[in-house]
Amino acid sequence: MTVKTRFAPSPTGYLHVGGARTALYSWLYAKSQGGEFVLRIEDTDLERSTQAAVDAIIEGMTWLGLEWDEGPYYQTKRFDRYNQVIDQLLAEGKAYKCYAPKELLDEIRAEQEANKEMPRYDANHPKIKAVNDAAKEGEPCCIRFRNPKEGSVVFDDQIRGRIEIRNDQLDDLIIRRTDGTPTYNFCVVVDDVDMGISHVIRGEDHINNTPRQINIYKAMGATIPTFAHCAMILGDDGAKLSKRHGAVSVMQYRDDGYLPEALLNYLVRLGWGHGDQEIFSRDEMINLFSLNAISKSASAFNTDKLLWLNNHYIKTSEPEYVAKHLEWHFENQGINKATGPALAEVVKLVGERCNTLVELAQQSRYFYEDFAEFDADAAKKHLRGVAKEPLMLALSKIEALTEWNTEALHHVIAQVCEELEIGMGKIGMPLRVAVTGGGQSPSVDAVMNLIGQERVIARIKMALEYIETREANA
């Protein structure tokens, strides 16, 4: 059997982390089994579905690198096929027309609730039967699936084990609305049959749909796929993950400076694991992934853990790869990458100090842009009269350099310390503030090397002017 999985989001909003984890698990299982992964857009909710949401889902999947082998398929383009199956079910007596108006169904539901009965549709209810018997062909009606009344639906969930639901607990599902549009639970089954889906991996909120869908598979004479229902993701407070917990959209994590590898690594561990291993490459995920290793219990989202992973991937990924993702943040922060060193060189120097690419872009700005003033606290502490002589000596030596590299600049600093008989801090910190505008940066010789000789000279002169002005105003 060829394994074929699918991710089938409804385009009523962005791709959230719960959906992304479901997509990841489906993608991983297909890849781990040498199978195929299908992307299907379930857009039968015409009122709520939007093209913007479709675009956001595809953008999120693409950013995560979850490439699909087939699709994207759109349910709204398959209405003829759904109607064909509905007509077949009607002809076989496995579906029927229901003329009961919504008002009557609401009235019956209220009566059932008042009598402490489970609210459900009953085709044999006297009021419903009377309406259906009196109806004439051509009057508005919906189509309902004739659910079996005897026996049970039993399936072996790959995560939760054996699940059994009695058929008398299930009512006759609407499969086509009065307006002629087919419904979600029906379309899903037809799609999975037509597309040859072997494994349905989805959230636990779909468990109640599964027995209803299995009965439709049986009515169609189709092979029933294997099901796996994943537990929900909770916020760090134990409540269901929602907007109030911060970013829940996949692309919001991109905007906040996360690498896709970090988010994928974090999501795969939200419910699945392999021993005590925390870091997984994409290939390791594929080779090690299994459905029966997914936990039945809900997982709590921990932003600190995600930040730790992101820092790991910024530090250990190829600098050119990190630089490719950093470009977006440079553009977003209005930094022109053409006015300074190669981004990959900056990543090598600054990357390990940053948890996100947003921080990395912010901390790299001085490589590409001159600043009008120094950080007030750093300048007050380090750009004082005592720093004037070391800076002037460093400036003269830097101006005289014919080779520009980190080693030569390190030698300049060492010479200043030796000639003036001062410690490294007496020149290192004033130089750092002079060339970066602030008090924190990687090794100042490496920083100056990337900034470039012309800019370094201009900035040291600016620092000396600052000191002179400060002394004059003292």
From Swiss-Prot:
Its EC number is 6.1.1.17. One of its GO terms (biological process) is glutamyl-tRNA aminoacylation. A motif ('KMSKS' region) lies at residues 240-244. Its main location: cytoplasm. The keyword Cytoplasm applies. Belongs to the class-I aminoacyl-tRNA synthetase family. Glutamate--tRNA ligase type 1 subfamily. This is Glutamate--tRNA ligase. The gene is gltX.
